[in-house]
Amino acid sequence: MANKIIESSDVHLFYGKNEALKGINMDFAENEITALIGPSGCGKSTYLRCLNRMNDLIDSATVTGKFLLNGQDIYAPEMDTVKLRKEVGMVFQQPNPFPFSIYDNVVYGLRLSGVKDHRVLDEAVETSLKQAAVWDDVKDKLHESALSLSGGQQQRVCIARVLAVKPKVILMDEPTSALDPISSTKIENMLLELRQQYTIIMVTHNMHQASRISDKTAFFLQGELIEYAPTKKIFLNPTEKETEDYISGRFG
């Protein structure tokens, strides 16, 4: 059994009086890809955003329960959320590069952390862009705007920006849904490589993607975690009827 890196227990989240998460219990192991699936509005993205406290940015959101990152309480009052979001990075659905050069995008987090040594920054740019499988595309135009790149290249630069600060966990909210099939395949292949060094938790509506690249899959429905198991079991022999109905396309 791989070491647990994140543990969550009895997680409830309310938007005002509306309960969006209803007692979620989930643990995540190191160096695994976990897919969170379920119909729109089921709570999977809400749960994902709990893992690095992005829901703190929503005034009406209230979270209860426990989240531990390597045994440390994510929601403890003394937790530094800037530090947390370095350790638990986030990649969004739409590529969101800053209106800077490719180089400045990748080193943004490092500079915020006070890194000034140009050799360190240069090395981080090359290493991160290689990990994100976009170095060969951009190595000759690092000082051009990241906004000039294709959507798939922009998303991989955003992934490189997350990797540059050396997170422990990478959260992804439908990272390929806005991309063409070729770009999506490149990112899927890259995630399989990154799994050797990182824990990856991703929301996806793409059942084929979940079955291809994830080690475990969690099915959410109406704010509840219905089933959480190895991906092969979820897709070939689910325990719960709701899981089978969703995967077979009977609803969702």
From Swiss-Prot:
* GO biological process annotation, one example: phosphate ion transmembrane transport
A GO cellular component term found in this entry reads: plasma membrane
Does the keyword Membrane belong to this entry? yes
Entry EC no(s): 7.3.2.1
Membrane-protein topology: Peripheral membrane protein
Which keywords fit this entry according to its UniProt record? ATP-binding, Cell membrane, Membrane, Nucleotide-binding, Phosphate transport, Translocase, Transport
Give the GO molecular function terms. Answer: ATP binding; ATP hydrolysis activity; ATPase-coupled phosphate ion transmembrane transporter activity
Q: Which PANTHER family match?
A: ABC TRANSPORTER I FAMILY MEMBER 17 (PTHR43423:SF1)
Question: What this chain does, per the record?
Answer: Part of the ABC transporter complex PstSACB involved in phosphate import. Responsible for energy coupling to the transport system.
- Recorded protein name is Phosphate import ATP-binding protein PstB 2
